[in-house]
Amino acid sequence: PISSGRDIGQTLVDAGVVKSVGAFVRQFEKTAASMSIRPGTYRLKQQMSAAGALAGLLDETNRVDSTITITSGQKMSEVKKRIVDIMGVTEEQVDAAFADTEAIGLPSEAGGNAEGWLLPGSYEVSEDDTPTTVIARMVKGTVDELDRLGVAPADRQTVLIKASIVDGEMNIDKYMPMVARVIENRLADTNGETKGMLGMDSTVLYGVGKTSGVPDQADLDNDNPYNTRLHAGLPPTPIGQPSEKAIKAVLNPAEGTWLYFVTVNLDTGETLFASTLEEQEKNREQ
């Protein structure tokens, strides 16, 4: 506690908020709530008393939101908007940062598109950061994660595409490896019932720029490369930023012959898996 109080005091002295580190440390140490001060950037006046400065740090309304949070399944368009909002930059500046694939460290197998390569998590933005430095951290996080999980560079993009679909279709951990198996089975089933088509709503929605909901008929009829009801195989890129759980599910899918699944209880998320369309129709009736 003493060192953290001293560190904060020194920062405040350097910024002209308080005159004396010692006075701030004394105030810090006799205030039990001091330990709840969160890291971050705060708006404080200059030339405050030690007690006033400490009170200012304990008031969350003075904390400037400098965190960019990426959640599993979030689209790159949503991440871009967050960068614009938090960093106070323009959309054009963010687009330019994403376009400089070398500067953000985007591997060549991504094909120039960072969708799926922005590791979910919280990123604290400092005054020294630019859109490029922040995006580079997100990309490096994904590269490091894939390396840690033993994914060969040649397989990275395919794994991220599949994992992003798993996340798009399923948010209950126990079913993720089963959904991953459905993807594998459908890709292999080129001459069977599903004719190699994934038929996944999450990809259809992505193709028409929707982030959630259920596709309507116009969405299902929209002929774009992400419409896996019209096109066999995988979509050209991931459809969001995949979670580590989804990536692990893709790397180790459950054993099974399923080609279909349907959630039968929206409250519990209970999902039934089927190997034939006939079986799927029976499950749908539940």
Question: Where are the regions a protein language model picked out?
Answer:
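Signal peptide-directed extracytoplasmic domains
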Residues: 1-146
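Bacterial extracytoplasmic/cell-wall-associated proteins, especially those involved in peptidoglycan
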Residues: 88-89, 104-286
